[in-house]
């Protein structure tokens, strides 16, 4: 990091969070403005999307890739007319393609809104409730763990050490009689 910008491995220039730029009411953006003219600035919250490969992490490889042959199959000896088979293939493929497009047109944006809200709530709860609750619990349980540790070292350690010394002299010998 240098001079109010982040540069990633591809050479993209990212803006620095406002607190690292100086006073939030008077950020020192003049020096940064001169450097911005050299490279294109990318905001950390915007991202280019790939319109060709829409599943770059392969989330739906095993679930959604269903073709005609995966659903409908005629065994040897039981074949319909070739024209019927071709028409069935075309009907299945076109119906699946256009019905998916229709459903995504109607429900895609509302579902994206619902899932966006859901994951925003989930992130908010994790950041502002779960992690602080766990940290609080760990701080509160620390005194109990100290008492438990003292108990174990005072009572259990000597007991098990004595039992270990008792059984340390036990020897087993096996003889095979003929």
Swiss-Prot record:
<dbReference type="GO" id="GO:0070836">
    <property type="term" value="P:caveola assembly"/>
</dbReference>
<dbReference type="GO" id="GO:0007519">
    <property type="term" value="P:skeletal muscle tissue development"/>
</dbReference>
<feature type="cross-link" description="Glycyl lysine isopeptide (Lys-Gly) (interchain with G-Cter in ubiquitin)">
    <location>
        <position position="57"/>
    </location>
</feature>
<dbReference type="GO" id="GO:0070320">
    <property type="term" value="F:inward rectifier potassium channel inhibitor activity"/>
</dbReference>
<dbReference type="GO" id="GO:0045907">
    <property type="term" value="P:positive regulation of vasoconstriction"/>
</dbReference>
<feature type="cross-link" description="Glycyl lysine isopeptide (Lys-Gly) (interchain with G-Cter in ubiquitin)">
    <location>
        <position position="26"/>
    </location>
</feature>
<dbReference type="GO" id="GO:0019065">
    <property type="term" value="P:receptor-mediated endocytosis of virus by host cell"/>
</dbReference>
<feature type="topological domain" description="Cytoplasmic">
    <location>
        <begin position="2"/>
        <end position="104"/>
    </location>
</feature>
<keyword id="KW-0564">Palmitate</keyword>
<dbReference type="GO" id="GO:0043123">
    <property type="term" value="P:positive regulation of canonical NF-kappaB signal transduction"/>
</dbReference>
<dbReference type="GO" id="GO:0071218">
    <property type="term" value="P:cellular response to misfolded protein"/>
</dbReference>
<dbReference type="GO" id="GO:0120162">
    <property type="term" value="P:positive regulation of cold-induced thermogenesis"/>
</dbReference>
<dbReference type="GO" id="GO:0097190">
    <property type="term" value="P:apoptotic signaling pathway"/>
</dbReference>
<dbReference type="GO" id="GO:0030335">
    <property type="term" value="P:positive regulation of cell migration"/>
</dbReference>
<feature type="cross-link" description="Glycyl lysine isopeptide (Lys-Gly) (interchain with G-Cter in ubiquitin)">
    <location>
        <position position="30"/>
    </location>
</feature>
<dbReference type="GO" id="GO:0000139">
    <property type="term" value="C:Golgi membrane"/>
</dbReference>
<dbReference type="GO" id="GO:0001935">
    <property type="term" value="P:endothelial cell proliferation"/>
</dbReference>
<dbReference type="GO" id="GO:0010628">
    <property type="term" value="P:positive regulation of gene expression"/>
</dbReference>
<feature type="intramembrane region" description="Helical">
    <location>
        <begin position="105"/>
        <end position="125"/>
    </location>
</feature>
<feature type="lipid moiety-binding region" description="S-palmitoyl cysteine">
    <location>
        <position position="156"/>
    </location>
</feature>
<dbReference type="GO" id="GO:0030292">
    <property type="term" value="F:protein tyrosine kinase inhibitor activity"/>
</dbReference>
<feature type="cross-link" description="Glycyl lysine isopeptide (Lys-Gly) (interchain with G-Cter in ubiquitin); alternate">
    <location>
        <position position="5"/>
    </location>
</feature>
<feature type="modified residue" description="Phosphotyrosine">
    <location>
        <position position="25"/>
    </location>
</feature>
<protein>
    <recommendedName>
        <fullName>Caveolin-1</fullName>
    </recommendedName>
</protein>
<feature type="modified residue" description="Phosphoserine">
    <location>
        <position position="9"/>
    </location>
</feature>
<dbReference type="GO" id="GO:0033484">
    <property type="term" value="P:intracellular nitric oxide homeostasis"/>
</dbReference>
<feature type="region of interest" description="Interacts with SPRY1, SPRY2, SPRY3 and SPRY4">
    <location>
        <begin position="167"/>
        <end position="178"/>
    </location>
</feature>
<dbReference type="GO" id="GO:1901844">
    <property type="term" value="P:regulation of cell communication by electrical coupling involved in cardiac conduction"/>
</dbReference>
<dbReference type="GO" id="GO:0090090">
    <property type="term" value="P:negative regulation of canonical Wnt signaling pathway"/>
</dbReference>
<dbReference type="GO" id="GO:0001570">
    <property type="term" value="P:vasculogenesis"/>
</dbReference>
<dbReference type="GO" id="GO:0031398">
    <property type="term" value="P:positive regulation of protein ubiquitination"/>
</dbReference>
<keyword id="KW-1017">Isopeptide bond</keyword>
<dbReference type="GO" id="GO:0098903">
    <property type="term" value="P:regulation of membrane repolarization during action potential"/>
</dbReference>
<dbReference type="GO" id="GO:0034141">
    <property type="term" value="P:positive regulation of toll-like receptor 3 signaling pathway"/>
</dbReference>
<dbReference type="GO" id="GO:0031267">
    <property type="term" value="F:small GTPase binding"/>
</dbReference>
<dbReference type="GO" id="GO:0060056">
    <property type="term" value="P:mammary gland involution"/>
</dbReference>
<dbReference type="GO" id="GO:0048144">
    <property type="term" value="P:fibroblast proliferation"/>
</dbReference>
<dbReference type="GO" id="GO:0002095">
    <property type="term" value="C:caveolar macromolecular signaling complex"/>
</dbReference>
<dbReference type="GO" id="GO:0044325">
    <property type="term" value="F:transmembrane transporter binding"/>
</dbReference>
<dbReference type="GO" id="GO:0009617">
    <property type="term" value="P:response to bacterium"/>
</dbReference>
<dbReference type="GO" id="GO:0031295">
    <property type="term" value="P:T cell costimulation"/>
</dbReference>
<dbReference type="GO" id="GO:0046716">
    <property type="term" value="P:muscle cell cellular homeostasis"/>
</dbReference>
């Amino acid at each position: 990091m240098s001079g109010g910008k982040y540069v990633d491995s591809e050479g993209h220039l990212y803006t620095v969070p406002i607190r690292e730029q100086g006073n939030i009411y008077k950020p020192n953006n003049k020096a940064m403005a001169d450097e911005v003219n050299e490279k294109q600035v990318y905001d950390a919250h915007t991202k280019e999307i790939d319109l060709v490969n829409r599943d770059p992490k392969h989330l739906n490889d095993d679930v959604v890739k269903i073709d005609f042959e995966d659903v409908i199959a005629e065994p040897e000896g039981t074949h319909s007319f070739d024209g019927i088979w071709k028409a069935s293939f075309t009907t299945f493929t076109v119906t699946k393609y256009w019905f998916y497009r229709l459903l995504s047109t109607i429900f895609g944006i509302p579902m994206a809104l619902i899932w966006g809200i859901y994951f925003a709530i989930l992130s908010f709860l994790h950041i502002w409730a779960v992690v602080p609750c766990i940290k609080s619990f760990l701080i509160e349980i620390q005194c109990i763990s100290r008492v438990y540790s003292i108990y174990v070292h005072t009572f259990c350690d000597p007991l098990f050490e004595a039992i270990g010394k008792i059984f340390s002299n036990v020897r087993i010998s096996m003889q095979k009689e003929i």
